[in-house]
């Protein structure tokens, strides 16, 4: 589809509401104003007018806002019609607008895409619009707004600028090898490179925090039947999310709860008790449990404290530990401390965290909450922080790898040409975050996930 088309879409959620907004962007927006309103409203003033059908009869009446380009969200001529939020009224008005030549329904995210293409915002800011709409906590919303206002982009642009200056110095050292001063070995390039790498590490740390705020952490509760997994899910959720009985195998399917711990989103997943089951339904539930474990960020290995005194997971259930994905973090949770009389708290056993608690009474659950937050390195004090997506983390990691390789070339062989190439690739990776260097395919994937009216 052409970006020269004039597009229209509903900017408010579907369904009934007090107000419904249609947004039009493109060269034909002024034609829509003349046809539907009978005039072109004064720029950036709210004008209360009837919205007319083809024969001149009013379909609705409401507020019209006219934003001539380039001083608009998309950088194009933009008209907003704010009428009553009934779906029938909005549909009639939309059909009326589409009778005009040169107009079509907008694709998902096309308004934001046009704003990006017209340099009204960069790619990270465009993504922040969707993240702000989808924010699941106050802290996530504040961080998304910071990204929209350019906090993340400013950090990335600072790194790109520093790399540009460093590349200029390295290129000079390559182009003028006969100078008396050996630029590659005078220590200045290494010092500047170390400074850029330190700044990049700081941005990566903040980006990981931002990614946690946006994506959350997936925690799977796993263990044998009747270990108290569903009771723990209820304790963490603060409500009766799962049925709890003394009958082994009560939970036969995956149960999911979305909670927040001091602003960090957490996806808690309760699974069927793991055992050799004869029942077909239970077997399916157990297979699904293993599928969830394979995708988890952390596993809470639930142990009935009344059945064993062991604390090492490899001793408690070696077959379970052997089947877990390599490097998957495990927290051993010894449950039923109210029965065994074990001291509540957290300790370390052979590289694994061990927590003693009672899911039934809730004693020790707060220790587990703090452990989950700290195990992911989540910082509740993120004033001025920003949200980050997985593609941002990948780009930052790629840039860091290129800088590491460039430093190795500098110190190992004083190879200026190879260092210059690694610096270029690092700069290119960072530029993908803001969209300075981005493929059309990536743009399509990003904006297709947006709302229609955005």
Swiss-Prot record:
Organism encoding this protein = Klebsiella pneumoniae subsp. pneumoniae (strain ATCC 700721 / MGH 78578)
Q: Which GO terms describe its biological process?
A: tRNA methylation; tRNA wobble uridine modification
Q: Which residues bind Mg(2+)?
A: 230, 251
PROSITE patterns, alphabetized: G_TRME (PS51709)
Q: Which family does it belong to?
A: Belongs to the TRAFAC class TrmE-Era-EngA-EngB-Septin-like GTPase superfamily. TrmE GTPase family.
Query: Has UniProt tagged this entry with the keyword Magnesium?
Result: yes
Name under which the protein is recorded? tRNA modification GTPase MnmE
- Annotated gene: mnmE
Q: Which Gene3D superfamilies match?
A: P-loop containing nucleotide triphosphate hydrolases (3.40.50.300), Probable tRNA modification gtpase trme, domain 1 (3.30.1360.120), tRNA modification GTPase MnmE domain 2 (1.20.120.430)
EC number(s) on record? 3.6.-.-
């Amino acid at each position: 589809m052409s970006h020269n088309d004039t597009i229209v879409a509903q900017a408010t959620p579907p369904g009934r509401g007090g107000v419904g907004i249609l947004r039009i962007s493109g060269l034909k927006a002024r034609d829509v104003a003349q046809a539907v309103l009978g005039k072109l409203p004064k720029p950036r003033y709210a004008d209360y007018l009837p919205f007319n059908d083809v024969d001149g009869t009013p379909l609705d009446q409401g507020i019209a806002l006219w934003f001539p380009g380039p001083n608009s969200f998309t950088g194009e001529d933009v008209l907003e019609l704010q009428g009553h939020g009934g779906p029938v009224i909005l549909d009639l008005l939309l059909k009326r607008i589409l009778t005009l030549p040169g107009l079509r329904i907008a694709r998902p995210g096309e308004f934001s895409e046009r704003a990006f293409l017209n340099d009204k915002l960069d790619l990270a800011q465009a993504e922040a619009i969707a993240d702000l709409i989808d924010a699941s906590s106050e802290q996530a919303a504040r961080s998304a707004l910071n990204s929209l206002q350019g906090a993340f982009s400013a950090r990335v642009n600072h790194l790109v600028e520093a790399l540009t200056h460093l590349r200029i110095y390295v290129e000079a050292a390559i182009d003028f090898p006969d100078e008396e001063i050996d630029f590659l070995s005078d220590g200045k390039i290494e010092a500047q490179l170390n400074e850029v790498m330190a700044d990049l590490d700081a941005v990566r740390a903040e980006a990981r925090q931002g990614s946690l705020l946006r994506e959350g952490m997936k925690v799977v509760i796993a263990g044998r039947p009747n270990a108290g997994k569903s009771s723990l899910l209820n304790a963490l959720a603060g409500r009766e999310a799962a049925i709890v009985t003394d009958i082994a195998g009560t939970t036969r399917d995956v149960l999911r709860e979305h909670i927040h711990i001091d602003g960090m989103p957490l996806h808690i997943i309760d699974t069927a008790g793991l055992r050799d089951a004869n029942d077909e339904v239970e077997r399916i539930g157990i297979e699904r449990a293993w599928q969830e474990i394979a995708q988890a960020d952390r596993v809470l290995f639930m142990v009935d404290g009344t059945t064993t005194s062991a604390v090492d997971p490899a001793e408690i259930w070696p077959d379970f530990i052997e089947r877990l994905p390599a490097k998957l973090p495990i927290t051993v949770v010894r449950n039923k401390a109210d029965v065994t009389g074990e001291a509540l708290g957290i300790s370390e056993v052979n590289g694994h965290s061990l927590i003693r608690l009672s899911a039934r009474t809730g004693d020790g659950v707060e220790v587990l909450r703090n452990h989950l937050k700290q195990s992911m390195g989540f910082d509740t004090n993120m004033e001025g922080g920003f949200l980050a997506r997985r593609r941002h983390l990948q780009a930052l990691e790629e840039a860091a790898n290129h800088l590491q390789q460039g430093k190795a070339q500098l110190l190992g062989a004083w190879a200026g040409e190879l260092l210059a190439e690694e610096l270029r690739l690092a700069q290119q990776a960072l530029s993908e975050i803001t969209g300075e260097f981005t493929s059309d395919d990536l743009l399509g994937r990003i904006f297709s996930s947006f709302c229609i009216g955005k």
